[in-house]
């Protein structure tokens, strides 16, 4: 046999590959020619397989990498014939090595299948290394290392050396420090780095890292595949001979041109070096034959620099000739605007061809995407066919939350400023970098990016010392439709064990000690958490107690010295026995003293908290806990523990360290932020391009308002046949037909109401060019005009239908753009899921029906209805449910059953795919649906045996149409014969809940078999962040609430904290059962859902749990919260009213200031006023209508006794509202100005040039002697204005249903005239049009003092623009609500005087006509009629013994909408107001722009009542009267004796009890209100008191008591006299002893509390108001203020 040269054979079959020992496993020299050819064939297959595949054994992934340095015996058998001879094998553990040149006598078949073959680890180098390690370990007998030297140790060492021998060697030329080299080795462990240290340039570490990043990114793709390097350094690829990599290097600025020139220079330098080394060879053909010497030299160059010179020669030829494939200068990427829409090509998107012709499936970006927008990058990837991209960038997680930072590993400083992010490198004087932050940040936050139908997902793979590795990968295959939610966390590793401490910062300007010589503020420092914890723990036990009543600076200094000693002992470096011990971390000298002071503050605060805990233990904490009363009742405990009152804590801290920045945040030591969660939501829907993803910007309303649309998912999966379903051929007549007819009519009516609203919205846009009147509509209005795109965007872009101006049309969406025929489109929440629209079209004709056999299972909550459905299921049964959550639960329990047999009722009616295939029907939660819908589903199914499951006393069907009364609300109303089965045993509810449910169930008893006795916990909270987390419970938790608003807030928190837990509304939770339930209320706004009137909702809410329910409420004091009352199960105790009047000490006669009466004569009219009257709606040809209003008999001046007992005032206030006297909002006001704040004010415009801290803060006020709980005067600041806007204009609770707006408005006006207008007198009113008059305008100017020099034409003036301000004088609450909620300032929204004077004149004429023709049982306190005492005395003496009813409206002004405006307009027009003026005034209120010029805040609003225009009070009075007339029935109207209406206040006096339905007030008029049956007559903060033959309207004495301690009286005697005069004028009736005695009783009756000190307090008020001298004894006045409060008293408008 001829001997072959195997070395030639080897290089011919495995050219360029590194040899493994398993390539030489066969003893080939022993083979014949035939066997040798078989061996060569198998060897080639082995080499080819190793180059492209891996072992595939996951258990060996830690050993075997993609280079396949090991091969198993099983794999070798698959490549070589079994009878071929193999070489000898040397093994250690599972690793074996073929010994070259040996023959073992065994065959391939004898190789072990699971043995790993490869890696020459038995060389002499290995043995020498192993011997040295063993000798060193064994030489140290005390270390015990000798015990570790074993077979396993040797195996690990062999593996390590084997990996090093086969790792990729990369030279790193930059000059680096040892720490930098260590970091690079840690970052890139798969490479063997050769640090040559021969290049020193700018930011070497960043350059070296970028070099290795390039190698790492390229290793993710096949070796020879074409790869795009976007914006990359083409010289780097040339340097390493990567001919398959193409760099797109556009010339975007001068620096790009400079870089390209430098790269060409480096290329020439490299080739010059090669010419010097290889002489003329370098210019020869690279494929030409070279001498052996030159060839060997090139091999050495290849080993050292990982590139062959021949490859460089080939690439350089292209660069030299100007046609290199390594790079181009074309810009990469395509923007969305460059995408072409071609309607002629199947309505598709066309992406233009790129300027660069290079195509590749793979791409990399090495720090080159900073200025390339992500959307443009994706467009470029689509152009070039890229499916996967890997990239790197400089990043810091703190960029998402901070404005500046430092990356130590890269020595890189970064800073965000003016929309850009700036980079600079420490100790580097070269140019820095800056990039657009909006473009840059997308790479840190985006997860899903799309271009047309191409859908890419971005992953942030790893973050290493300032460098972020990311990948962008195209999604292949079909995309599931629906919502896809992604999130990722940015972790701040360096902050894990840190505290953020607030420390004092003192700047001493000079040593004089004068004002301004010392500047004090606060700053933040980062400290070790372990250090701070240790020092505080020790010092808590070591500081000396402090007597704050007599503070000694020496005590403070001693305590600080103790803290500083401990701080030093834990932070300084110690030397013990010659050894240096470093304790924690050193504290910089500038931080040492401030940190010790802050720790001192924290210790004081901790002691304070300890005292609170002890007081809490003694006093007990209940749901009615209030801070003010709690502190007031426990002062004695605080004195005993701390030695000073609790409300002096901040004063002490400020006195301890005097600075201008007062202590407003009591949290001195805070944990640092450890992570930030970034969320993104993607919706994939059907569009013209196919499955097109739509990205949604992350915000509360868009991402977390998850609607559980009944049937939406099922519709997409069901049949698309929209034809009429087949029905069984049966003839049916009877009552069910009427029920189904009502259901279909209801569906049509709802569609009609939605259509009319859409039509009104479209008309408003066509008339005004904007969506005036619907900007703040809670129905999420959207208007699209093809001429301008979206005029107003909706929150969601997934509506099924839209209104085109004439009808509803079905929509398809292209991203956020709808596809429809026509110009206009209107969408609302009502057009998103239009089930009723589909019903009304699909079932246009009502089929005749017969009644099947129906069994009704009416069971209490938790009786096992759903469990029985699951247990009884068999093939042939169809299961339907009204509730989508219930369907999901049944499907989970019956996972093997086809989903088409378990569906919602709505889904089944729209696509009845199983008609005729079932013989029995189960319908769960039947009570939630209209009975006609149930009967229709039964008829369509053709099933004669039906069982309905539900609870007749849980949440019933909700009628969403306010003006569509239903005859059939439940199946019980149908009149069919049901086989009813009552089930009264609950298996779910614990025993304590069952006791409460026994009182709620009216028709069924309830009992439980649960062994859980106690399950109720009530927890007062302040926000959603205090709601317990799911991990606090043992088992699954369900979170439920009443409103979608509360649901979205908690879902937002869960998403931010990466918490997965079920959150539902109570309505959506019906039918569910959980071990633990958290029932929460976040809104403090009164809502009808929380009252007893919504009993079914409360029944469902408290009965979802088996073990535990926690009720978290922000309003624990709300007595109208039925769930709270039921869970508390408190017993109301009655208190006897006591009357304890002390004798008068002296008698005083009331002394009033002289005030000459002004005769009511016609004012003298000036020329400007006459001109204004002629310009603005002058009166008609009829005479100006005036009517003299009768003046009722005067009330004789009362005389009485008075006494001076100031303590009785404080006692009376504490008896009525415990804790109010200790209210001090000074600290809260300061916290509002300097503390963190979150406002929900919607869209506002803020002029930043007007931002100012506080205005009008220099006024001085008189100091009251009595702590009555009066509130401080508010400062005008941006924060106070923001709070006021949030309370007065934002967050309107929408409770309206759908209704016919015009029809109901006309009915309300008709009822108003029928109730309150004497039509005979009305018919005698002048027929002329009301207008303005010069006398009326002049009277307005005389009264207000506003002199208008330049009159304007109102019709040509922008009356839709209002000015805004806040009322600095805060109206205090008559309850104890101020203790638990910060009182926000009221707002005033007003016109310019030139507009107000005209409007006032016109409305003044309307007022006189209204008063002239109203019925006597209506009284609106306007002008002369404000003397209610005379009115009631003349017409209704004796009515104090009748029945009184009071309607208490909440958020009255901002709850008004379009229907209220329409009612007002119709009444004005009927009374003869100029239609042009009415239309002008109405349009101005439809959409108004409001601007506060003090702080620069502006916003828009719609129909909300303006709080300061010319028609506010009268307009509110008309609306209130019209609403009450609409809801009160005619029989109850006959019982009414009189009705008082003033703004939103009302009082009805009737001869017997009447019913005032509250549902229409909420469903139609959007009013949140409650019905009050007062124990005594009370109207507009006045008590109605009978005194002899008179009825007196006496002001609420509680207000008078509080006003004796007013804190807003300017510090001068003149203001004090004015305030006293005004109080004495309004409180004149209290000076009568009989009135005082009756008033003391009535107040106790109204407050339901005993107040024995009240009579004494009223006598003290009498004494105080008797003279200025007496009143001044309650204040300290130093006359430091120039402001004078004036009580305006003048003529009244007639």
Swiss-Prot record:
One of its GO terms (biological process) is viral RNA genome replication. It catalyses: ATP + H2O = ADP + phosphate + H(+); RNA(n) + a ribonucleoside 5'-triphosphate = RNA(n+1) + diphosphate. The keyword Transcription regulation does not apply. Belongs to the ssRNA positive-strand viruses RNA-directed RNA polymerase family. GO terms for molecular function: ATP binding; ATP hydrolysis activity; mRNA methyltransferase activity; RNA binding; RNA helicase activity; RNA-directed RNA polymerase activity. It comes from Raspberry bushy dwarf virus (isolate Malling Jewel raspberry/R15). Residues 984-1145 form the (+)RNA virus helicase C-terminal domain. Disulfide bonds: none annotated. PROSITE patterns: ALPHAVIRUS_MT (PS51743), PSRV_HELICASE (PS51657), RDRP_SSRNA_POS (PS50507). RNA-dependent RNA polymerase replicates the viral genome. Residues 1442-1558 form the RdRp catalytic domain. The lineage of its organism: Viruses, Riboviria, Orthornavirae, Kitrinoviricota, Alsuviricetes. Residues 829-983 form the (+)RNA virus helicase ATP-binding domain. Its EC number is 2.1.1.-, 2.7.7.48, 3.6.4.13. CDD domains: Mayoviridae_RdRp. This is Methyltransferase/helicase/RNA-directed RNA polymerase. Residues 194-444 form the Alphavirus-like MT domain.
